[in-house]
Amino acid sequence: MQLPSFLEVYEGLISTSSISSTDPSWDQGNAKVIEKLASWFKDLGFSVEVIEVEPGKHNMIARMGEGEGGLLLAGHSDTVPFDEGRWSFDPHKLTEKDNRFYGLGTADMKGFFAFIYEAVKKIDWSKQTKPLYVLATCDEETTMLGARHFTENAPFKPDYCIIGEPTSLVPIRGHKGHVANAIRVTGKSGHSSDPALGVNAIEIMHEVMFAMMQLRDKLVKEYHHPGFAIPSPTLNLGHIHGGDSANRICGCCELHYDVRPLPGISLDGLENMLRGALKEVEAKWPGRLEIIPLHDPIPGYECQHDHPFIGGVEEICQTSSETVNYCTEAPFLQQLCPTLVLGPGSIDQAHQPDEFLSFDFIDPTIDVLSRAMVKYCC
């Protein structure tokens, strides 16, 4: 049987739409792309299991080899939506131009599975001593559903994991988490000619925002990690809306904010700090404040700095590991084994019109993955 080429696999991935979104009109599921991945890896000799996590949402686990431990290569199979008017190319067609692959998912990150596929074909597997696993997850771009489900129900425990997000082939050993909430203040509307007729939600929100800015200062003062370019947690007040007319007492005001906690800050601890910051406002205005999560919180992540896995991958890549401020599935997979984030392409291309991957990454990525497979499986 003739196996598909690297280019054919890449084209097949990009042409198979797998958008995930919190907007139901965009959300598609990933069944079709998982079906293709399962078929390709079966043809390579992997045993493959497809798990339906939710209707239309699937994970794929492929395994080559027997025994314990081994290496897990992981990534998400979904993409973000796209703004067609801002693209110069068809997002669902792999376009080659100016030594680049253009298309939705070329860098972030369906294309990574084509690199795994090609690297596997170059290995002499007769010398294999430990298993190689490939994990393709669902809904990374929205809820991290696939990674959460896999971690909670993992059928094996690898020695190490590499997640192929676009890092320009620089190993990433840590990143901040992400917590995003809405604070809704419910007042009582009324005619502005008599303030006593109502309770102004904007005025209460003013007190909330003062408390949140005090919390921001506390986070900066109490937490510091020298391994990050921005060494403290960040708290951003990102969106606010309240009221509907200048001559009405505002009956409702809502503030959206996010926090990017450092590794080591527990989500429960952060929640307690938030509640503590708002305690006085809530006591003054009982029943008028509500905190609503905008998505499931993601903790910070860090692979132990002196772990041999970091040194081994740094040697393969011939570059030092770093930390970043964006989020991946690493906090969940790190619960199973030491995990690094390492993949082709630049994070600057993620979620952008005319997303692309430079041809300069093709041979080095296949080489890095091949060497990792040999080092940790053979």
UniProtKB/Swiss-Prot annotation:
Q: Please give the name of this protein.
A: Acetylornithine deacetylase
Please list the GO terms describing molecular function. acetylornithine deacetylase activity; zinc ion binding
What is said about its interaction partners and assembly?
Answer: Homodimer.
Q: Species name for this entry?
A: Vibrio campbellii (strain ATCC BAA-1116)
- Cofactor requirements of the protein: Zn(2+); Co(2+); glutathione
Query: Mind listing the UniProt keywords for this protein, alphabetically?
Result: Amino-acid biosynthesis, Arginine biosynthesis, Cobalt, Cytoplasm, Hydrolase, Metal-binding, Zinc
Cited SUPFAM superfamilies: Bacterial exopeptidase dimerisation domain, Zn-dependent exopeptidases
Any idea where this protein resides? Answer: Cytoplasm
Q: Biological process (GO) annotations?
A: L-arginine biosynthetic process
Q: Which InterPro entries match?
A: AcOrn-deacetyl, ArgE/DapE_CS, Bact_exopeptidase_dim_dom, Peptidase_M20, Peptidase_M20_dimer, Peptidase_M20A
User: Where, by residue number, is the active site?
Assistant: D78, E140
Which CDD domains does the protein's record reference?
M20_ArgE
Reactions catalysed, semicolon-separated, are: N(2)-acetyl-L-ornithine + H2O = L-ornithine + acetate
Spell out the HAMAP family in the cross-references: ArgE (MF_01108)
Q: Which family does it belong to?
A: Belongs to the peptidase M20A family. ArgE subfamily.
> What are the binding positions for Zn(2+) 2 in this chain?
D108, E141, H351
Co-factor binding comment: Binds 2 Zn(2+) or Co(2+) ions per subunit.
Q: Where are the transmembrane segments?
A: none
Q: Which residues bind Zn(2+) 1?
A: H76, D108, E165
- What is this enzyme's EC? 3.5.1.16
Pathway participation: Amino-acid biosynthesis; L-arginine biosynthesis; L-ornithine from N(2)-acetyl-L-ornithine (linear): step 1/1
What function does the entry list?
Catalyzes the hydrolysis of the amide bond of N(2)-acetylated L-amino acids. Cleaves the acetyl group from N-acetyl-L-ornithine to form L-ornithine, an intermediate in L-arginine biosynthesis pathway, and a branchpoint in the synthesis of polyamines.
Naming one, the record's GO cellular component terms include: cytoplasm
